């Protein structure tokens, strides 16, 4: 059998190929197993001829990296568990859009020995792709329409099982539970953490990892994002970057494949309180100071003596909200400092201020179309005072990112940012709101209810970026 395998094997530069006669749907055909042996390339493919009544109907193929979850061998049969892109059938227009579909392909070999050899070869090829073997899955049962557990059972779990990935699932029970989990989790047992949630839980996990004593190692743990909440901008941004359809299944497959990319982490603090990543205001006076990224130096005005920053000393909290001075452990925030001459400013009034490090804020809102996962910048979007008709138009155009072309919108990339929220124009007794991924964390003194955990409205915020500090599972 080994001699036969060597005889059937063809080698070209960086490629190893083998052809066998197989049976598919009781029809004999030729199938070719091709592996890439070139350094830096991933996987291989299985290609076979399709025939009907002895007539050729073309070829089909499965790419082990892009299309296959796993392989199973029983007797003379090889089952390839695929999650491949197929064309939808349109009722009125023939072929429709493409979508990923879960499908099994069974190939019957001539002998059990050949089935075992091919099965082992395919399995080793998939193994070489660097996919995760052990995952810790955090499910938020409260986010969005409270569908997290259902999404996990119907869309996530079947794909993980088909891929042969072991996992432990835990549901969050209260706010900041995911942060506590990440803070205390034995990371040596896992190859990644997957979150079935909105963006808020992902932020909690990042904060938990960064509060650990071993944060430098902990933050390298790859994070997977599966949409299951209200704000799913991170998952939408990842899938949109490779033109994949937005779905929990596609996000899960991105984790299964094991591709990774770096993610910028923004340190946002106010006095001794850790803060936010995204926030929005109504029409308010306020002050924004920033260090523009390369190519955006013409935005704003240079800071003069009257506009110098009068913010407080920046101290981060420990894992659960206690400031710790010299005894504090964990990530201390970005250490990058900027010369005073680099800072510029823009004063209000503003209708809205958005700060993003990914393009999408949710599945249908794209405030920052030029945002990148790891460019060391934050994308700053400022909506200035404008007529209500213009504001309505902006709310519609923000769905595709075209709002940034409006003369009432200022859009730029910054390396650092300082924000001092102001009071509402025409009514200085009314303040605005500050939120992080949909969670309210600060609002004006006029609020009927004031949570003691909220930040102080009106006190300046400072935000800086650590480029590529965290790691994400990504589609490609």
Predicted features and spans:
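Catalytic core of DAGKc-family lipid kinases
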Residues: 150, 162, 172-174, 187, ...
């Amino acid at each position: 059998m080994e001699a036969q395998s060597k005889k059937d094997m063809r080698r070209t530069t960086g490629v190893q190929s083998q052809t066998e006669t197989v049976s598919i749907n009781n029809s004999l055909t030729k199938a070719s197993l091709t592996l890439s042996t070139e350094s830096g390339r991933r996987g291989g493919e299985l290609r076979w001829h399709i025939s009907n009544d002895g007539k050729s109907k073309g070829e089909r193929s499965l790419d082990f990296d892009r299309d296959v979850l796993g392989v199973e061998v029983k007797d003379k049969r090889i089952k390839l568990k695929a999650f491949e892109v197929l064309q939808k059938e349109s009722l009125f227009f023939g072929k429709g859009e493409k979508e990923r579909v879960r499908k099994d392909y069974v190939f019957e070999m001539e002998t059990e020995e050949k089935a075992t050899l091919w099965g082992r070869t395919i399995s080793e090829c998939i193994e070489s792709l660097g996919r995760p073997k052990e995952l810790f899955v955090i499910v938020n049962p409260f986010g969005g329409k409270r569908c997290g557990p259902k999404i996990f059972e119907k869309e996530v779990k079947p794909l993980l099982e088909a891929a042969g990935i072991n996992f432990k699932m835990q549901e969050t029970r209260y706010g900041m539970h995911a942060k506590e989990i990440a803070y205390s989790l034995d990371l040596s047992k896992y190859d990644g953490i997957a979150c079935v949630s909105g963006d808020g839980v992902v932020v909690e996990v990042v904060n938990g990892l960064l509060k650990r004593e071993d944060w430098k190692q902990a933050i390298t743990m790859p994070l997977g994002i599966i949409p299951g909440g209200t704000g799913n901008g991170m998952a939408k941004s990842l899938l949109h970057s490779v033109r994949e359809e937005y779905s929990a299944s596609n996000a899960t497959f991105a984790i299964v494949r094991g591709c990774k990319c770096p993610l910028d982490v923004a340190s946002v603090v106010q006095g001794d309180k850790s803060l936010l990543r995204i926030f929005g205001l109504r029409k308010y006076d306020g002050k924004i100071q920033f260090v523009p990224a390369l190519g955006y130096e013409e935005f704003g005005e240079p800071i003069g003596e009257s506009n110098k920053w009068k913010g407080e000393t920046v101290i981060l909290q420990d894992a659960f909200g206690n400031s710790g001075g010299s005894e504090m452990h964990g990530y201390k925030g970005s250490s990058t400092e900027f010369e005073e001459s680099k800072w510029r400013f823009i004063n209000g009034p503003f209708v809205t201020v958005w700060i993003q490090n990914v393009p999408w804020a949710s599945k249908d809102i794209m405030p920052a179309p030029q945002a990148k996962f790891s460019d060391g910048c934050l994308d700053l979007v400022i909506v200035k005072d404008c007529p209500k008709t213009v504001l309505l138009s902006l709310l519609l155009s923000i769905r595709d990112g075209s709002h940034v072309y409006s003369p009432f919108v200022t859009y730029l990339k910054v390396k650092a940012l300082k924000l001092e929220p102001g009071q509402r124009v025409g009514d200085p007794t009314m303040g605005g709101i500050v939120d992080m991924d949909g969670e309210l964390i600060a609002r004006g003194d006029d609020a009927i209810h004031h949570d003691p955990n909220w930040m102080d409205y009106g006190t300046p915020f400072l935000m800086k970026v650590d480029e590529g500090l965290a790691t994400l599972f990504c589609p490609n």
